[in-house]
Amino acid sequence: MQQNNSVPEFILLGLTQDPLRQKIVFVIFLIFYMGTVVGNMLIIVTIKSSRTLGSPMYFFLFYLSFADSCFSTSTAPRLIVDALSEKKIITYNECMTQVFALHLFGCMEIFVLILMAVDRYVAICKPLRYPTIMSQQVCIILIVLAWIGSLIHSTAQIILALRLPFCGPYLIDHYCCDLQPLLKLACMDTYMINLLLVSNSGAICSSSFMILIISYIVILHSLRNHSAKGKKKALSACTSHIIVVILFFGPCIFIYTRPPTTFPMDKMVAVFYTIGTPFLNPLIYTLRNAEVKNAMRKLWHGKIISENKG
């Protein structure tokens, strides 16, 4: 049997084998990906350019948008190109790189969502100490720790993937490389590796989700003591965060907290959190946030005026 040191390439089966549906997949996900990149880049540029968006919440939103763009880019371009390709070939090195990038930016998104929840908790439950606790220096340290944690997680995942011995046929029943579909191709007992996968990715997803839900329950409970205006503003911000948390963590928990059994719905579930959620995040955070919308209007209004003067 050939093992992973001699695997030249894999073949991705993609979302569908039907030619007509592949064209539909191409159009839909091209729109989704372009929307994701444009939306998140718009948020990044707005936060960097606006003086009114200097609070820790927008500091973390900047990194969430960056992680969203990179997370989607780790899978979407190949899915789009493969939709029009007769043979969806990915080399072994490209596959391992995709596994690493997927987990690096996916984990970073999880950690940033936790930091945003911490920020909301301090802002609402400890408003007098907020400037001290969430100082710029503290926020930078937290983001650096998030990057370090993400790097450790993705390195652990790639080590597991590199240890897998593969035997032909090298057909991955997915649109991207990830540990779950790769485990199905391994010519070895994958019980221990799957246990490590669940204890790593599964534990991160499940524990982070529980931490986030509990923190937002505490935040919402504490809003009873706030004024109507303050309650409305805080509730709007928290609702946006809760929507993002549920949309992202639901599919992640489904994928990473069970044995490596392939269900027909797995690929569509993965599409939802790798491409769907990064597309929806900019819409959720801009449509429900008056400060971001106003900053965007000022930014582009000023840009139009400067162009007209020029």
Curated annotation (Swiss-Prot):
Q: Which InterPro entries match?
A: GPCR_Rhodpsn, GPCR_Rhodpsn_7TM, Olfact_rcpt, Olfactory_Receptors
Entry annotated with the keyword Zinc-finger: no
List the GO molecular function terms.
G protein-coupled receptor activity; olfactory receptor activity
- Keywords from the UniProt entry: Cell membrane, Disulfide bond, G-protein coupled receptor, Glycoprotein, Membrane, Olfaction, Receptor, Sensory transduction, Transducer, Transmembrane, Transmembrane helix
Instruction: Give the transmembrane ranges.
Output: 24-47, 56-77, 99-118, 138-156, 194-217, 234-256, 268-287
> Pfam families, per this entry?
7tm_4
What membrane topology was assigned to this protein in its record?
Answer: Multi-pass membrane protein
Superkingdom to which the source organism belongs: Eukaryota
Q: List the glycosylation sites.
A: 4
**Function of this protein?**
Odorant receptor.
Q: Which organism is it from?
A: Homo sapiens (Human)
Asked if the record carries the keyword Membrane, the reply is yes
**Entry protein name:** Olfactory receptor 4C11
Disulfide connectivity for this sequence is 95-187
Gene3D superfamilies, alphabetically?
Rhodopsin 7-helix transmembrane proteins
Query: Which residue ranges does the entry give as Cytoplasmic-facing topology?
Result: 48-55, 119-137, 218-233, 288-310
List the stretches on the Extracellular face of the membrane: 1-23, 78-98, 157-193, 257-267
Where found, per UniProt?
Cell membrane
Any single Gene Ontology cellular-component annotation? plasma membrane
In which family does this protein belong, per the annotation?
Belongs to the G-protein coupled receptor 1 family.
